[in-house]
Amino acid sequence: MSDRPWEKLAEDTAEKRWEAQQRQEDLVPGSTTPGIGAPLATVDGGGKSADQRRLRALALGPTLALLVDTLGRQIIADGVTRTADQQGDLAALWAPWERAGMPTRQTALWKAALTDGEAFLLVAPNGPTAKLEAASVARVGVDWGDDPTADWPARAVFLTKGGRPTLYVTSQDLIRIDRSGSPYEAVRHGLGYAPVCRFAPYLSIDGDAESLVDRLRIPARRYIKTVHDRLLIQHSNSWRVKTVTGLDDPGSLEDAERMKAHLSTSSILTGGDGVQFGSLPETSMQSVLDAERADLGTLAALASVPSWSLSGSQLVNLSADALAEAKSAERAHITSIQRALGRPLLNALRASAQIEHRVSDANDYTLRVDWRDTEARSLSQAADALGKLSQSLGVPAQLLWQRIPGVSPAEAQEWQEYADAHPSELEAYARALTADGEGTPPIEES
């Protein structure tokens, strides 16, 4: 093996870095080096005239970025719970996520995973605690060894934006690399695996991480082409053209220009025998507008999001059941993404617990992620539904607190602790009854 194995691993990421830059240009055209985003930009055959360049720039828009935002903003991890009765401090388990600022940075992590097909989270020792560092696919080179579907890679290298290696991760050590490419510090983590978690929402059974942008590039190109055609009509053929036939030859170029100027500015036109005036109608845009809506609807359907989330159209006279049905595909899509992202997130927390010598937490596979409910429901609707669950089905009200929109599991736990510390008079009396040990109140002696 080479004395500098990270160099070969970094070289192998060059194509991935270029692809990531191309996806960024597809998300927000014009945000990176001109010419990178050729697949979406050449909607008119790559014309060079000023008018063509201007119309091309107007046609390109951040439609894919809006789509990724629509999905990414609805994926919020609020905490973890256990599905079995095990001992352990959930606050300590969740603390590395909080220390890394991930409650506010997680949306960027999920959006990077959706855009590039995968994003990464490094779990590293930081004194007595664990530290989490997120990185996009453009800044990480990974070797999966013989199993591309494994939870942990065989080794990994972290890069600068320019592609220079800065950190080499093995199953035992974190090796820091200076600007000359030489190692200068090694930190032993001793986990037995390279602590780099991969968040891949569309990971195939063979380990291929598909990108949402790559999946939707063709329908997005179709939509942009339709928008470009509409702009061409608006720019060139959206007004009536006046015509005149039978005019005498003016005789000179100056007279011809003078007559042309007169005809173009006069509101009342007159002519001699045989002169006929008319007009050519403007090109109708109805068909291209219908095509634009159809292309946007196709793009939304392929992304499993409601079409109105991309078009901004208003919803009129939709019942609650119809609205829920319209959003069912999006909800199923987000649920599948949450399932895919939940396992690597829990792996990161278990690795953090192992670094912090919390053996019980590190071996706890009963954990599950609490994902925030981001459905657009009013508080009155939620209260009515939860009240019916409690009264009609006998579900304890305290267990429904965390299902209230906007209430996190941590807040629900605080409510439970407060309720335990401040019982109602009836609950206090019931506790006094059971304090005797026989279920009867104590007898006062006279």
Label each PLM-derived region with a short phrase.
Residues 1-132, 441-446:
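Extended, helix-rich architectural segments
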Residues 37-44, 126-129, 247-261, 348-381:
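Charge-rich, acidic-biased intrinsically disordered regions
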Residues 105-113, 121-122, 284-380, 388-390:
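C-terminal amphipathic alpha-helical
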Residues 109-110, 124, 234-242, 309-314, ...:
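Short coil/turn segments at secondary-structure boundaries
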Residues 115, 120-210:
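Extended, regular secondary-structure scaffolds
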Residues 185-325:
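Extended, charged amphipathic alpha-helical segments
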Residues 235, 241, 327-346, 352, ...:
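Long, compositionally biased
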Residues 386-446:
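Activation/maturation switch segments at domain boundaries
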